Regions:
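Acidic/histidine-rich, surface-exposed loop or edge segments in extracytoplasmic proteins
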Residues: 68-80
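Extracellular/periplasmic catalytic domains that process cell-envelope and extracellular macromolecules
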Residues: 64-69, 103-104, 144, 167-170
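Periplasmic OmpA-like peptidoglycan-binding domain that tethers envelope proteins to the cell wall
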Residues: 112-182
Length: 182
């Protein structure tokens, strides 16, 4: 292949990579939920007790409760730090807008920090708490979310999203849970 042809192929590959990076994809959309997506994920679907009936008369099967409504957000921090990366602020802006929704006005929100399994258990626990608190601070400071509505806690690497790959980045996340009315 001549030098010009090689450069042309390289240019076409580069154009394809650029086009792929700006084209919306399902994974990019799920990694960057809208405020409406977050609200929908956090709004309880109705009463969830054993033996309770829904409005349609369908009885829930005992033991099928899945816990409080929640959503995992991939909020990037600087390496081994609770300092937010610039793209994390975009995600927090969307989260802040969602938490201001009238549908979530009376909700108490639990912010749960998770890490991957790199590092010691003690270090990961402390880091996950600091990261959850960093998210809480931004929501209170920038979006006027009432501080008493938000609780931060860390789980370290105790609840891996992908336990088969404990050091994978998918395990580094912040979980947002609606834990009930204020």
């Amino acid at each position: 292949m001549s030098g010009a042809a090689s450069r042309r192929v390289g240019f076409l590959v580069l154009c394809g990579l650029i086009a792929a990076s700006v084209a919306p994809t399902a994974s990019a959309q799920s990694a960057n939920p809208s405020a409406d997506d977050i609200v929908e994920a956090l709004v309880p679907s109705g009463p969830r007790g054993l033996g309770m009936r829904s409005l349609r008369g369908i009885e829930e099967t005992p033991g099928t409760e899945t816990g409080p409504p929640s959503i995992d957000l991939y909020i990037n921090f600087k390496l081994n730090s609770a300092e937010l990366e610039p793209e994390a602020l975009r995600t927090l802006r969307v989260l802040g807008q969602a938490l201001q929704s009238p549908k979530l006005k009376e909700s108490r929100i639990l912010i749960v920090g998770h890490t991957d399994a790199k590092g010691s258990a003690t270090y990961n626990q402390e880091l996950s708490v600091r990261r959850a608190n960093a998210v809480r601070s931004v929501l209170v400071g920038a979006f006027d979310i009432e501080a008493d509505k938000l609780t931060a806690e860390g789980k370290g690497a105790t609840q891996l999203k992908d336990s088969a790959n404990p050091e994978d980045g998918i395990n580094r996340r912040v979980e947002i849970r609606n834990v009930g009315a204020n």
